[in-house]
From Swiss-Prot:
Keywords: Amino-acid biosynthesis, Aromatic amino acid biosynthesis, Glycosyltransferase, Magnesium, Metal-binding, Transferase, Tryptophan biosynthesis. PANTHER family: ANTHRANILATE PHOSPHORIBOSYLTRANSFERASE. This is Anthranilate phosphoribosyltransferase. The lineage of its organism: Bacteria, Pseudomonadati, Pseudomonadota, Alphaproteobacteria, Rhodospirillales. SUPFAM superfamilies: Nucleoside phosphorylase/phosphoribosyltransferase catalytic domain (SSF52418), Nucleoside phosphorylase/phosphoribosyltransferase N-terminal domain (SSF47648). It comes from the Bacteria. The gene is trpD. Mg(2+) 1 binds at S103, E235. Anthranilate 1 binds at G91, N122. It comes from Azospirillum brasilense.
Length: 355
């Protein structure tokens, strides 16, 4: 796909852009779009790319810069058509927590409540099991035709969008390693190929909660919660309070929530620790078969928040009740089985059912 057609800033090449950021100056959105277009088109040298990313990192990326970069990521992505009302539950990763797969399990529960979920993700960054790892262990075919991803999204109400398959331009970035987090750690959750207009987005550091809400506002999101747990999780945590930046009706507000608001007891952090993909897959199967405990509680809390963002629950308590019913009725287990079945099927010319 072509990149955004909006006019760029005054800078016209990577050398000029690099000089500006190296001097400690911020780029405007158009200049940032130009820079990332150059990088993702393979027209920046490794040294230019590394220097640019580190200069942004040292100074601190701005809302303009993140927005401009995300526009390029979105424009270059291979898209997937999604139903109206689709939500994404995604995190930046990198929180180093090693928990069970929380947002992935919550995504299945949300879909079982009737809300389409375009789950955008990748393999593990900070744990032994990322979204792709655990879904693969559950039997989802991660290499299925993209037509089947679309079919799953419409028919099972959940599709897994494997980031490297949709963001081919990232191949031009992959060889560059600067040994620390960069803006690209933030861009994945902002670049859903299904153009989901509603997001529950977890971040690895509290400093990004409010800025990313403003980025999503600029990118046209209708509603979003950007969250960071007080224990460091890029999820809504059950061990204590969670900082939330809410995008609603074009306004961004920041507040804290507590698990008790959903009727959920606080948990000890060690009860959320997971294992490798197979251990975490078994935990998800047990959860959908009715297992109780801290893992169920944190999945319920995150699903409840997503249902609220999706406009399907007035508050966390109502969202929690809907999520509980989705698990206890067997609907979540059925959705997972449907997802596995579709991704392991053959492409047909049958029309995709509307939700």
């Amino acid at each position: 796909m072509s990149t955004p057609s909006a006019p760029h800033g005054d800078l016209t090449d990577m050398k000029a852009i690099l000089a500006k950021v190296a001097a400690g100056n911020a780029l405007n959105e158009a200049e940032a779009s130009l820079a990332f277009d150059i990088i993702m088109s393979g027209n920046a040298t490794p040294s230019q790319m590394g220097g640019f990313l580190m200069a942004l990192r040292v100074r601190g990326e701005t809302v303009d810069e993140i927005t401009g970069a995300a526009r390029v990521m979105r424009a270059k992505a291979i898209p997937v058509e999604a139903p109206d009302g689709t939500i994404d539950t995604c995190g930046t990763g990198g929180d180093g927590s090693g928990t069970y797969n929380i947002s992935t399990a919550a995504a299945v529960v949300i879909a079982a409540c009737g809300v389409p979920v375009a789950k955008h993700g990748n393999r593990a960054m900070s744990s032994k099991s990322g979204a792709a790892d655990v879904l693969g262990a559950l039997g989802v075919n991660l290499d299925c035709d993209l037509g089947l991803v679309r079919k799953a999204l419409w028919d099972a109400r959940i599709g897994f969008l494997m980031a490297p398959r949709h963001h081919l331009a990232m191949r031009n970035v992959g060889p560059t390693r600067v040994g620390t987090r960069t803006i690209f750690n933030l861009l994945g959750p902002l670049s859903n190929p299904a153009s989901a207009k509603r997001q529950l987005l977890g971040v690895y550091a509290k400093q990004w909660v409010e800025p990313l809400a403003h980025v999503l506002k600029r990118l046209g999101s209708e509603a979003a919660w950007i969250v960071h747990g007080s224990d460091g999780l890029d999820e809504i945590t059950t061990t204590g309070p969670t900082t939330v930046a809410q995008l609603k009706d074009g306004e961004v507000t920041v507040f804290e929530i507590e698990p008790e608001q959903a009727g959920i007891f606080r948990a000890r952090p060690e009860l959320l620790k997971g294992g490798d993909a197979h251990v975490n897959a078994e935990a998800i199967r047990a959860l959908f078969d009715g297992a109780q405990g801290a893992y169920r509680d944190i999945v319920l809390l995150n699903a409840a928040a997503a249902l609220h963002v999706a406009g399907k629950a007035g508050d966390l308590k109502e969202g929690d009740e809907r999520a509980r019913h989705a698990i206890d009725s067997g609907a979540a287990r059925a959705v997972l089985q449907h997802l596995v079945s579709i991704t392991n099927s053959s492409i047909t010319n049958e029309p995709v059912a509307a939700p």
